[in-house]
Amino acid sequence: MNVKVENIEKNVVKLEITVDSEKFNEAVKKSFKKNAKRFNVPGFRKGKAPLNIIKKYYGEGVLFEDAINFCCEDTYPKAIEENNIKPVDYPQIDVVQIGEGKDFIYTAEVTTVPKVKLGEYKGVEVKKVSYEVEDEAVENELKSMQEKNARVSLKEEGEIEKGNIAIIDFKGYVDGKAFEGGEAKDYEIEIGSGTFIGDFEDQLVGLKKDESKEVNVSFPEEYGREDLNGKPATFEVTIKDIKVKELPALDDEFAKEVSEFDTLEELKSDIKDRMKKELSEKAKAEYEEAVVEAVGANAEIEIPKVMIEKEIENMVRDLEMRLKYQGLDLKSYYEFTNSSEEKVKEYMRETAEKRVKTDLIMQEIAKVEDIKATEEELKEKAMEVAKQYGQKDVEKTAELIANAQKAYLEIDIVNGKVLDLLVESSKEIA
């Protein structure tokens, strides 16, 4: 095998690979063995005609397609490895020379991993990130707990007031016609919750059980449905029942009922501690992101479009999987969000480019700093992932993961080590 490499443009190379005639003839014979049964030649049982007869009857090129595939599968990986070429996509294969008794020559044009020119990555200055737990946030959490533990009972007499829960039947009309999704029966709505559009809920205040009313509202301009965006609507509403919500008193007894604590002050203290931890983790994540962005701003890199497109495809697949867990599919998602595949992909583009750039920079730093994943770290990471699957035999699952996903585990471990290096060497400024 002989290989010539030509740089035809930035991050794109063309390899001219020559396979000697003897090797190509072996590939033709292999192709014959694979396809012999499909050839039907007069005077021979189907699949029993010898190679030379097949060539005469069908022409020498009849076996070339598979022979080409066999040769490329064997020689292309060797060619890129020997020339230290790291492709990011499948190659474009073109045949230059092919024929009986001739060397087989083909070209493989491929986009390669771009070169990364690192700037300053140690000691980058990043603004300090910190959050304080506000008393209001603690009070809001207590109110939320209070709401969840409220006692709800029927309001036998009287009108709807703010804070009441109304059980309603409704049917909506736009331009005088009923619209899809605009009708429901025995629907519960808390007055003042802002669940419905406009002042729909406010217009129910003062109504009694079994009373009906026409409610007039307008849909927001960006409601998410082209047939409803910005349009006025009329709803026929009937009050089926009214419920009143009684909130429990915020006292020590409440704390005992909803938690492991004996006093309200202990419960408040616990809520504050949990919020501090959450905000500390949030600040840490934001600081790490800022460090990576600062390092990225110092680096020079021209990312091939194909890498961004591949990352977008990965993001779409991830979205599809998340939707599947919710019992949805992409088509339903596009309809619900008034979007399309093209719009979603375009929305993802900036994030995809950022991810690819970050990965390339992290890999380059790992190379410069000689950061690698050890076998012990791989085992630990595989075990960590295996535990998330909830299988009985965690060790066996971890072993399978370590073998099947080794490359992904290595990247995850190495990127984590690089991030630690960048953060530890960074300078926090006010």
Curated annotation (Swiss-Prot):
GO BP, one annotated term: protein unfolding
EC number(s) stated in the UniProt entry for this protein: 5.2.1.8
Coiled-coil features, chain-numbered ranges: none
Keyword Cytoplasm in annotation: yes
GO MF terms held by the record: peptidyl-prolyl cis-trans isomerase activity; protein folding chaperone; ribosome binding
Example of a GO cellular component annotation carried by this entry: cytoplasm
Cellular localization per UniProt: Cytoplasm
Main location: cytoplasm
Catalytic activity of the protein: [protein]-peptidylproline (omega=180) = [protein]-peptidylproline (omega=0)
Record-linked PROSITE patterns: FKBP_PPIASE
Keywords carried by this UniProt record: Cell cycle, Cell division, Chaperone, Cytoplasm, Isomerase, Rotamase
Record's function text: Involved in protein export. Acts as a chaperone by maintaining the newly synthesized protein in an open conformation. Functions as a peptidyl-prolyl cis-trans isomerase.
Domain remarks: Consists of 3 domains; the N-terminus binds the ribosome, the middle domain has PPIase activity, while the C-terminus has intrinsic chaperone activity on its own.
Family to which the UniProt record says this protein belongs: Belongs to the FKBP-type PPIase family. Tig subfamily.
PANTHER family for the chain: TRIGGER FACTOR CHAPERONE AND PEPTIDYL-PROLYL CIS/TRANS ISOMERASE (PTHR30560), TRIGGER FACTOR-LIKE PROTEIN TIG, CHLOROPLASTIC (PTHR30560:SF3)
Protein's recorded name: Trigger factor
Gene label: tig
